[in-house]
């Protein structure tokens, strides 16, 4: 049985032909499912748009970040308690600019959050924007009160220019801290402008996983092969697939959550284990289109549809939770309801062998 994506091939041919290895049966089990009420009010804020989640094993505290662009309330994060069945918010703090003020409406797009194991605080990403005004994505640090502590420099190819950099809504969706907190790892949701088309039903695409030091030095950057979109829209509406979360696993391995949405069909959520050890470092590769590079290998951990949850919503956040009583690791997922009454904030707990 094949255990990984084939080796060095032209990027364009990989996107059509390469297939990840199948998941091993029985390795993942759905053990918990809960939801939050739509437009729930907490401490003067409307809860929604929860696009990132993290768990601190040293304190037992959970963090979730809202992708509210300071349009309903100031950009913010929440703390929470979670026992696997009941998810209870315990606090909220605004995310602050270096001058101590809140972000103006539309100037920030929070996406992911990770507790810092080496300092009292957390890291978070903003997707930026490719609109009338170009706003670079960002990786920022904050203390537990939300005050800014640092801003990590980005490699040039992740910055916005008129012809290069992340596409709109396909920038830094995923963030994780690896190697004991010494390595800052991000994933773009989709390919950069210079890296070709986003996934379609005919082909996948190459996003980029970037490894940096805590001071911003680029340690490596790898091409990650996104799946094609799983179905065509029967209504002619939108159809997409992208990486919405990355999570440190073991050594040079990471879990990547691919979230696909097809208008008139629904969502598909697949989690892959990706291994960068044999991948080409592409930090100096200007464009991945037709580039002769070896992407990171990936193996399917679980297709959420196989676990038959009550629904599959717009899941964007992923974190390791506490060990379960039987010794298995818990993997917790959270959905971004886009503040829509037609969606739900869904929290799923998976048991992983």
Question: Where do the PLM segments sit?
Answer:
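Secretory targeting and sorting signals
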Residues: 1-24
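Sequence/structural signature of beta-propeller domains
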Residues: 20-353
